Amino acid sequence: MKVRKHDLEDMLRFNPQVLEFHFSDSDLYLELEGKFSQKLIIHCYEYFDRKLLDIVSLGETNQVHSQEKTINLIQKAIDKTKELGKQFVGTPTLIVHPGGYSLNQLPEQDIQKMKNSIVDAVKKLDVTGVNFLLENMPPYAWFFGGRWISNCFLSASDMVDYCEQTGL
């Protein structure tokens, strides 16, 4: 069941088996009281400080974080997921969008660079103690009131390649 801290008590009345928190950047400071009999899923924030996270970013812009900054911010979400996970049953899960965003169509060589960098980027993360899942996105994502193009992790072959390269 999707939940935010302010409606947690109301949602617990439905006796869900899983609680999924959709993080915003302020949720790095989220504190929960008590223990929970549910499994925990955290949906990582898509943006931080008004800029999109993009794990395959080809460079920082005024609207997209660099790959290095994105990896750092995702690691913080992983660490927070592990911390909160101690209050839940089972191994916590973190869902992350793979990025590859642009406002305009990119040249095929840039798209291939993004696709080729995804496994190396994920390997830079310490995902020990969490189920780390990349979520495929639709071809057009709606961020900041604009229609962004998702350039990678769209096709079944992208996902199969990722799973084979990471041993999933």
Predicted regions and their residues:
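N-terminal pre-domain/capping segments
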Residues: 1-79, 165-167
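Active-site acidic/histidine proton-transfer and metal-coordination neighborhood
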Residues: 59-168
